[in-house]
Amino acid sequence: MKISFDAIGEKYVTFLAGSGAAKGQVCKVSANDTVSGCAAGEAFCGVVAEVRDGCAAVVMGGYAEVPFSDETDPSAGYATLAADGDGGVKSVTSGGRSCLIVHVDAAAKTLGLFL
């Protein structure tokens, strides 16, 4: 039996899509009603699920999958993560946000986590 966390507790919010808002990448609120891509080290508000017609659907809570750029693979459990500047996340010791990592795919460099 395969374990799936897809759609558990997902909370989507629609924003205007600003610069750098791209599907599958972390984002930040950059202006009124608008999300944009994050610079390295910035805290992120969610993960862009879709961009269409100038709007972005953002997963703000629940399960999401994101790329990671740590040289050492993160471990399952709670971790403090921030944007890596390339649409993914990296582990940080200060700043960022706490997330529950439930799956690490070292080969694909992706994390399954709860926001």
Residue ranges and their predicted role:
Residues 1-115:
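Surface-exposed, low-hydrophobicity beta-strand/loop segments enriched in small/polar/acidic residues
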